[in-house]
Amino acid sequence: MKHKDSEHNIILQSVFRATLIAMIVADLAEVIAAGIDGMLTGRYLGANSLAAFGIAKPFYSITGILSAVLSSGAMTVSSHWIGSGDVDKTRQIFSLTCFLGVVLSVTAAGLGIIFINPFTRILGANADLFFEVRRYLLGLLLGVPAIVMGNVLTIFLQLEGKRANVTLSVFATIVVNLGGDAFNIFYLKGDMFGMGLATSASYYAALIILLYSFIKQDSMMRFRFRDIDYAMTGELLSKGMPKATRRICNVFRPMIINHTVIMIGGSIAMSALSVQHSSSDFLELLGTCLADVVVLMCGIYYGERNREEIANTLSMSFRYIMFGVMSVTAFAFLGARLIASFYLGSNIQAIEAAIPCIKLYALKLPFLAFNEIYMGYFQAIGDTRYSHAMSVLHRFVYVCASVVILGSIFGIIGVWAAFPVSEILFTITILILAALHERHLPRKIHDMLFLPASFGINPENRFHRFIRSREDAVSTSKEAYNFCAEKKIIHKRSMLVALCIEELGINAVTYGFSRKNQIAEVSITAERDDLKLRFCDNGRLFDLKQWFELFHSDDLASHIGIRMLFGLANDISYMNTMNTNNVIIKL
């Protein structure tokens, strides 16, 4: 048992770590672009310009709503079609998503430019900051199509397993944005419009790299107008809406906070808040990406009704909070002056105002990570209404109420204190809800799953093994046959399941394993008349084209066990996501 636990930890840790890294890389472009703008603006254009930068920050949340709906919807819908081997429908959703992305993003950019004056006022710009906020927004609005389409194309590149292209696009974003900002400040002696324009240019540079990935011959995705099926639009948008709820809250929350800060503390306080906004993009990154990992991994395990793996995934995310997020918290609290100086240069008054803001903000990071993980978890277990309601409470109601109440009582320090207070209150809310659900105080992770007692698979109906070698593949195949026989599965079906496991295992070991810690996981569940086989390995990713060609090979002896089992299957799914190959066969 100890050996199997060790094997289990290897693949779970490998999947979790690889997925987390992929999420962080994918989010880095926007984070770094905003961070570079904030740092250079504060140091070289002054405190007022930095305040304008902070006021305009909801712009990223607004564009994020559109990006979230399209990218999340495309991921949900197309992943099933890729897994089922339906490349034509996958290309249809790709073409539809790209078409909608271009039309909606260009429309949004045009409306933003036409109505830029009221848009600037809605964001909270007063008379002193109106001109600079307006100029910055104008530069950013020109880049909306590139921002939206970059997010959309990134999703499809991840589905194809081309993470190197995503990394290259992030690198291009950093280089072009930094170079453009420096050119604007030191050569053109420009203003906030130039800063926004440089950011837009960096997104277009990244978009060009992403587009090139789809032009190459090895790409499965091709945009064709004839592939667009407008009837899929409703499904695409509805599947993407849950993720958009948090983005919507991110738009309206800063408006209330900005108004409160300016009213209580003026431009100096707003520049302090802008430093917090700019640094938060980096400091919150680990926590928010942990939440994204939980959405994916717990969503898979929820579909399998695998209570134990759900608990293990949550436990692993909490360990990252203890060692990762707590380290970030210590850095932000102890390095508050360094962070403020990084953004504000030698502006002593602004630096002193920013230090307490950063320190109190740092205290919220562990609670924020915990809360974000549970927001993602509620989405993963399919409780959409609960996820929406809790997101509104967390992202809007608690923090805005805390800012207004504590700010009116304690002044600007009360506003800064509202950030950790609101997160602590929401953490307490989750614990109370867990206690009500379990009818006792939560004492272990299984008390925090918010799942009915009947959820899960009887251990007697589940077969679970690991494969490291060809010998393991053969022995696992025999054990799988015995398991199926015990469950009174007909002989032919039991033989094909065993043969399929042996062929998948030997293929993974022979062609996919090149490192010490690579391993394959096999699970079979047998309930009533349903039989499900899941094969997962963390070896070299399958080539999707070869996967689809497997169904049409002229060599009838090639992969005979796999092909014959596929002929009996009710549903076949394959995905090379989260740095693993996943084959799911339902009989």
Could you describe each region identified by the protein language model?
Residues T41-S61, D128-E132, M192-F193, L197, ...:
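Interfacial/gating helices of multi-pass transporter permease domains
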Residues A18-D37, G139, G150, T173, ...:
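Transmembrane helical elements of multi-pass membrane transporters/channels
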Residues K478-E502:
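Conserved short strand/loop->alpha-helix "switch" segment adjacent to the catalytic nucleotide/phosphoryl-transfer site
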Residues M1-M23, S78-G143, Y187-M241, C298-K364, ...:
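Short alpha-helical transmembrane segments in multi-pass integral membrane proteins
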Residues L533-H559:
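Glycine-rich/acidic phosphate-handling loop/turn and adjacent ATP-lid/helix
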Residues L50-G110, G150-V166, A272-A330, F370-M390:
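Small-residue-rich hydrophobic transmembrane alpha-helices
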Residues S71, L140-L159, V166-N177, M195-L210, ...:
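Short runs within selected transmembrane alpha-helices of multi-pass transporters and secretion channels
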Residues D447-R465, F566-L587:
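Flexible, glycine-/charge-rich segments associated with ATP-binding catalytic modules
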